[in-house]
Design a protein with these regions (language model features):
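Carbohydrate-interacting/catalytic domains
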Residues: 1-153, 158, 487, 492-497, ...
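Conserved, mostly hydrophobic/aromatic
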Residues: 17, 64, 155, 197, ...
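Short, flexible loop/turn elements at secondary-structure junctions
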Residues: 21, 43-45, 55-57, 68, ...
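Core domains of carbohydrate- and sulfate-ester-processing enzymes
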Residues: 68-137, 206-221, 275-300, 415, ...
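Short catalytic/ligand-binding loop motif for oxyanion handling, primarily in non-cytosolic enzymes
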Residues: 71-75, 161-163, 203-207, 267-270, ...
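Substrate-binding/active-site clefts of carbohydrate-active enzymes
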Residues: 121, 156-333, 340-363, 383, ...
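Hydrophobic faces of well-ordered beta-strands that scaffold small-molecule active sites
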Residues: 151-153, 195, 259-261, 336, ...
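Conserved alpha/beta catalytic core and glycan-binding cleft of carbohydrate-active enzymes
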Residues: 353-518, 523, 531-535, 568-575, ...
Length: 706
């Protein structure tokens, strides 16, 4: 009876489907001419319908027809006229075309729930495919890169390589293209340690987008939680996409990099009561979806997509955890970023970090060992949960994004929170014993402006989406540096380049886990579109024809990443401890905060609403951590200088207690200048809107007694 799904054993295939409401289930097999053979599933145990069919081979296409009650008013939507995808399908062929047969109601009378649409959907929907599970992994192993040593690169399978002339044309925009040696070599040289792929679970192309000549580019519309998206395969749709994906993961592991998946377990592509019947709705609607109490025709929606999975249902929970285990054990992925993860915590009405889902994940010996990253919000009441996830999770830190953007556009009263975000957001995470790596720091991501657009546009420009520029976030916390969009004014372009360097330096020298939005390192633009979910074209794809300025930005970002990874004080495992208020002793703390005069900042400095500058000392000799060999870590000391003012500021370096000699290693105003040396108490100019980093010239050595 188990496992669920279609399991090939070399001699045949076992099919198993869960449905509590089904009265009869037919397995539908399709030949090369799409002729359908129906086989009634005669075996049933504990609501699992199963049959073993000898002689079937990988590549066999199939689906299900489920007979049972059709009573939408009570949440029952069985309709045997609809060919249904296997929820556990490991491969899926085709797409949907928006035909009326995909829906369980008639277009002419959508409100008449008693009139069941009896059109057959088989010719208009996707089909599940049997796969061969055997694959030569060789000696492949998970890299298991420590959280604090991680630098994440968010990427899109198609967007990463579609315009990459180094990749052969026939594999651009595919898993094979992403695994092409020059692509992996580029990421290794950049210095990132993990690629986080936007959704690659099989998703649906919405008909309303297709009618406008657009498509679901981002992929947050999952219908197959076990199947890699077929459109990203260069080798076929009947299982070939599985091997192509595995080969990609194997190539990244060989290069010492991790593969993290952006997963969407909070809803499915079947939408609300007006959506199509593709799988779960027709199999056992009430076991998978959260329905409105007292009005079970409608779906409870905290995701903005029309439905939400029922997180107190053991069968929905089993589906999700089985999927997660499959992607770790069979596909060898190294972690997950959970879209709208607050929905997964809604066992009942409210978000609850003690919900069954988190209990299951915490104790699971497979899932709990990989990286778990939450997008810690959804659209429901109380859905903003930054800092509220269990201790073993990391979170996208939305407050980090907002604060860094505000600081570099000189918004009042941002300095205190900016300082907290730089140090790992202990105010959000330390209270429940978490560490800096609980914070995934980012300034841009797929959703919103790119880094280049963040410094080039004050307003969104989403006209290409066909929604009258009404979609997308209006409050972007962006600043166009004086001109909206592209310009030939040298001073404006110079400032934009400097602002991008400022934000990259902030991101890569903050405690926590940095995440870079793919293409930002080469100043990718979406022409001001901050909601390019439907733009599978040059608006979203990365343009790899790099001019001098884009090449220089790439080199700068790579330099910063390697500098971060080479110095443990820049990515500590524990939060800093600083000087207590009123402490005027000569003890040198782990971190010290100075104003531009070289004086330790006091309460008046922090409360100055128009303060946009500071100097930070990081003590590399006081790192309470050990390396892999049990030796206490030591590092150089660093000084970080931030100036978000519109004019230059002269900073006096700290006295010699903090270090005698310093070398300038990063200057966002003059990124190509040779390194200069400074002594304690010397003055150094931070140009307007710029960042400086100085490193002590002392050689790190073990503390006495070790």
């Amino acid at each position: 009876m188990y496992p669920l799904g279609a399991s090939y054993d070399g001699a045949g295939v076992n099919f198993a489907l869960y449905s509590q409401v089904a009265q009869k289930v037919e397995l539908c097999l399709f030949d090369e001419h799409d002729a359908e053979t129906r086989i009634e599933m005669t075996e049933r145990n504990s609501y699992v319908w199963h049959n073993y069919i000898p002689g079937l081979q990988p590549g066999q296409r199939y689906g299900y027809r489920v007979y049972g009650p059709y009573d939408p008013m009570h949440g029952l939507r069985c309709n045997p006229n609809k060919l249904l995808l296997d929820p556990y399908a490991k491969a899926i062929e085709g797409n949907i075309d928006g035909d009326e047969s995909l829906f369980s109601y008639w277009f002419k009378s959508p409100d008449d729930t008693s009139a069941m649409n009896d059109l057959d959907s088989a010719a208009h929907t996707m089909k599940s495919a049997v796969i061969n599970p055997y694959f030569d992994w060789g000696n492949d192993q998970h890299p298991y890169i420590s959280y604090h040593d991680s630098v994440i690169y968010e990427a899109h399978v198609r967007g990463m390589t579609n315009l990459n002339m180094d990749v052969p044309p026939d594999i651009r925009g595919t898993y094979a293209g992403l695994a092409y040696p020059s692509v992996i070599e580029y990421l290794k040289k950049l210095g990132v340690t993990a690629i986080e792929l936007m959704p690659i679970h099989q998703f649906v192309n919405d008909s309303f987008l297709q009618e406008k000549g657009l498509s679901n580019y981002w992929g947050y519309n999952t219908i197959g939680f076990f199947a890699p998206h077929n459109a990203y395969s260069s080798s076929g749709e009947r299982g070939e996409q599985v091997n192509e994906f595995k080969s990609m993961v194997k190539a990244y592991h060989h290069a010492g990099m991790e593969v993290i998946l952006d997963v969407v377990y909070n809803h499915t592509a079947e939408g609300n009561h007006m959506g199509p019947t593709l799988s779960f709705k027709g199999i056992d609607n009430a076991s998978y979806y959260r329905l409105v109490e007292g009005d079970q025709q409608h779906y409870f929606d905290t995701t903005g997509t029309g439905n939400s999975l029922l997180m107190r249902s053991p069968h929905a929970l089993q589906l999700i955890t089985d999927s997660l285990r499959y992607w770790v054990t069979e596909m060898h992925v190294d972690g997950f970023r959970f879209d709208l993860a607050a929905t997964l915590a809604r066992q009942f009405q409210e978000v609850d970090k003690l919900s069954a889902f988190f209990d299951i994940v915490e104790q699971d010996p497979i899932i709990s060992r990989v990286k778990l990253i939450a997008e810690p919000w959804d659209l429901g009441s109380g859905g903003y949960q930054v800092g509220g996830f269990p201790s073993s999770w990391s979170e996208w830190n939305g407050r980090y994004r907002d604060t860094v953007r505000d600081f570099w556009r000189s918004q009042p009263s941002t300095l205190p929170e900016f300082a907290s975000r730089l140090m790992g957001s202990s105010d959000l995470y330390q209270v429940n014993g978490r560490r800096p790596v609980a914070s995934v720091n980012f300034i841009t991501a797929h959703d919103g402006f790119t880094m280049n657009d963040l410094v080039s546009y004050n307003e969104k420009h989403n006209e290409a989406n066909g929604e009258g520029n009404r979609d997308g976030e209006s409050n972007n916390r962006s600043w166009n540096c004086g001109v909206e969009g592209p310009t030939n004014i040298p001073d404006v372009n110079d400032l934009r380049q400097r602002q991008m360097r400022n934000m990259f330096a902030t991101l890569l020298f903050s405690q926590g886990i940095p995440m870079i939005c793919g293409g930002d390192e080469v100043a990718r633009t979406q022409q001001g579109n901050n909601n390019a979910y439907c733009q599978d074209n040059e608006i979203s794809w990365t343009n790899w024809h790099l001019d001098k300025g884009r090449k220089e930005l790439l080199a700068f970002v790579s330099k910063l990443i390697h500098l971060r990874l080479d110095h443990p004080v820049l990515h500590r495992r524990r939060f800093f401890t600083g000087r207590e208020p009123g402490d005027d002793s000569n003890m040198i703390p782990q971190v010290e905060w100075f104003d531009h005069t070289g004086s330790i900042m006091d309460m008046d400095d922090w409360q100055n609403t128009h303060a946009f500058s500071m100097m930070i000392y990081l003590n590399g000799s006081d790192i309470p951590e050990v390396d892999w060999y049990g030796n206490r870590m030591v590092d150089n000391d660093f000084i970080l200088i931030f100036n978000a003012h519109y004019e230059p500021i002269m900073f006096t370096l700290p006295d010699e207690r903090y270090g005698r000699k310093w070398q300038l290693v990063v200057d966002t105003h003059n990124p190509n200048e040779p390194a200069l040396s400074y002594e304690a108490g010397f003055m150094i100019t931070a140009q307007s809107r710029s960042f400086l980093m100085l490193m002590s010239d002392k050689k790190p050595k073990k503390p006495m007694g070790l």
